[in-house]
């Protein structure tokens, strides 16, 4: 790495430490993201066709909404399978992202905290408000990871204000973990009296933009008032050489197990 690049990385790190987040514009290859979006949609559309719903709709969005209402179990299964697409995982461990975590965010020994999360947010595809508009919370509460843990987020389309973009509160990571207990959906919500709504910043990112933020940063999602689905991906990383993480004994709070038949219905 040349001196100029090293200085640039250090300046970005200083900004990241102060603000708690950094947005890198046009960081990811558009073609890779568009291909990933097609793969995700193919999973749902395959079941739209299999359930003989394709003849009743003109657009993909109509098809997935019909699948949601006609066969929710299959819809939910599709939602689970898109979390495990190979290209979703490949992006999370790509050299470009890992190098950024190490060279800019200064993770010494990055490790994956939990599986990737592919989010699809729309009021027409939700059984609970939490599935389309997530209140302000801190990921650090549920991660229980390293003190310098990082969350990476990026959209799979241009995300305008109407789509309900990622919303963050700059510098809120400096408050430490102030979220209360984790709820049934796995979120550590922050009481509204602990932050100022006037400080909220909406990140209207374009396709290819990516956001790196401190896991303690207070954030949530805007309200998607459009007729479109907001697609995005999120990844979480710990630092196995972080002293606090070492002293805590490397807790890993995520439970992976096969589901019982009654749970799958």
Where are these regions (language model features)?
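Catalytic core of non-heme Fe(II) oxygenases with the double-stranded beta-helix
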Residues: 102, 129-203, 242-253
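Non-heme Fe(II)/2-oxoglutarate
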Residues: 2, 46, 50-54, 62-69, ...
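Residues that flank catalytic or metal-binding motifs in active/ligand-binding sites
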Residues: 84, 114-115, 148, 162-164, ...
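Active-site rim elements
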Residues: 85-90, 195-201, 220-222
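A structural signal for short, well-ordered beta-strand segments
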Residues: 116, 152-154, 233-237
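Non-heme Fe(II)-dependent double-stranded beta-helix
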Residues: 1-18, 25-136, 142-143, 255-260
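A structural signal for well-ordered alpha-helical segments within the folded catalytic domains
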Residues: 95-99, 150, 206
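Short, solvent-exposed loop/turn segments at secondary-structure junctions
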Residues: 28-30, 118-119, 141, 159-161, ...
């Amino acid at each position: 790495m040349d001196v100029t690049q090293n200085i640039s990385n250090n300046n970005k790190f200083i900004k990241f430490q102060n603000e708690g987040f950094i947005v890198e514009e046009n960081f990811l290859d558009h073609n890779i993201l568009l291909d990933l979006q097609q793969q995700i949609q193919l999973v749902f559309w395959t079941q739209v066709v299999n359930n003989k719903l394709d003849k009743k709709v003109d657009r993909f969005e109509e098809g997935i909404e019909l699948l949601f209402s006609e066969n929710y179990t299959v819809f939910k299964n599709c939602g689970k399978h898109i979390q495990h697409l190979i290209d979703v995982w490949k992006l999370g461990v790509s050299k470009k992202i890992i190098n950024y975590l190490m060279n800019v965010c200064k993770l010494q020994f990055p490790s994956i905290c939990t599986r990737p999360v592919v989010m699809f947010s729309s009021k027409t595809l939700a059984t609970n408000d939490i599935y389309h508009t997530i209140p302000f919370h801190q990921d650090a509460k549920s991660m229980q990871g390293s003190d310098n843990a990082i969350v990476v987020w990026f959209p799979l389309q241009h995300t305008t204000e109407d789509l309900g973009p990622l919303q963050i509160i700059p510098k809120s990571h400096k408050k430490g973990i102030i979220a209360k207990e984790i709820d049934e959906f796995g979120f550590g919500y922050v009481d509204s009296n602990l932050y100022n709504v006037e400080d909220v910043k909406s990140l209207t990112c374009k396709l290819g933009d990516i956001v790196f933020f401190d896991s303690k940063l207070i954030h949530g999602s805007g309200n998607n008032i459009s007729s479109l689905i907001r697609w995005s991906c999120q990844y979480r990383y710990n630092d196995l050489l972080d002293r606090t993480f070492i002293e805590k004994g490397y807790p890993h709070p995520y439970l992976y197990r096969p589901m019982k038949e009654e749970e799958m219905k």
